[in-house]
């Protein structure tokens, strides 16, 4: 799939302005779509919207299908009569506390729903449960057991539940029927609010780009419900986990800890789980960015008991067969290949043979020679180009860091290349990617606003302080919208 020549903004749902401490699908999300339209932007890119697990990372979710119920808007629930007009509005510091407070705020909606006379809403709920039973039943059960087990990982549950003994699961279904139904209800509300938001975006000419991580967390409903899809020991512990080998930046490599797929079994079964997963996501989004695309050619398998990634080994992945099966089943591959990192000829061939646009990041272009693929004069049309991603510094922060510390050569190269004095480096970055040949240019909202690294979304390899940044109510201004629209028109986006 290729994109038309266009531009868009990267802003996660949690980063929308909110009086509750975390963004949601409420009025601010509709206001942002209005802003995108007025700014001449055709796309809104977000991060994964699943329920986050360890570290609150959206890339480490408890399910490959479920939604993060902290994104449910209390205001929209109240407007439907599913919360009192004067619902509680607790304030919380930090995204984890804000998410927990949000879930408590919306909890009464389930009891109100059970008493409602709105038969149409009840019918919608039943239809949602029927259509999504292939993941919803296991996810609701997983969440209820996890809650009653003190949030312990499934590997630490009592043996009968851990190993999915039918008698043990039947007892939970019988004793926790109401709690299971509540989990299903809030998933119903999540996707109902999301569908309404996406319809509004489409009506205003804005496409939404989602994000799918390659791997799932070990402590997830997917691994618990379908252990045969993963390389696990008899007791459910991972035989091997994902990571990357030692390199210049890390002498011991990186041990991510995600279980590795049983690719051979998945291939023998026609890649059914992958087809379901990506079909599900393409119902939610206009296109999907696939994280760690290079992992579809080979995986660095680290022994599950090792503390570092030093003793890993490369294992082949049948990516070509997978994408052929996806193309046959889905009728089109509306994907962006996140092909950053150690890109081998095999990765390039897989990307190009299936016509997938890759990624280029302007920040990575400076400090080397003119052949750097991240410099705009080297971009090709079937590419999505960024000033930076959620893992990068902001443009302003990038300049400040190189003025104060190392990287002076990269900054000098940057300023010369962009013919810039650096005072409005974020605008220079935006202009450079807009002017490039890459069909789709995406700019993080932090760069639109010219913010420094205090607004950085994520610092890879660290825990704490990430995923916290949020827009302020006045950030969707006519001034920045006008500037973006003028650039979009100037460069035919």
Where are these regions (language model features)?
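Surface-exposed amphipathic alpha-helices with a cationic face
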Residues: 37, 194-202, 327, 351-352
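Alpha-amylase-like alpha-glycosidases and glucanotransferases acting on alpha-linked glucans and related
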Residues: 2-5, 10-12, 18, 56-191, ...
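Conserved, well-ordered alpha-helix/loop/beta-strand core segments that scaffold catalytic motifs
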Residues: 183-216
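Terminal-tail/helix-coil boundary detector
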Residues: 469, 473-493
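Catalytic domains of carbohydrate-active enzymes, especially glycoside hydrolases
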Residues: 2, 27-52, 284-285, 433
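Short acidic catalytic loops
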Residues: 44-48, 201, 207-213, 281-295
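N-terminal catalytic cores of NTP/NDP-binding nucleotidyl/phosphoryl-transfer enzymes
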Residues: 8-33
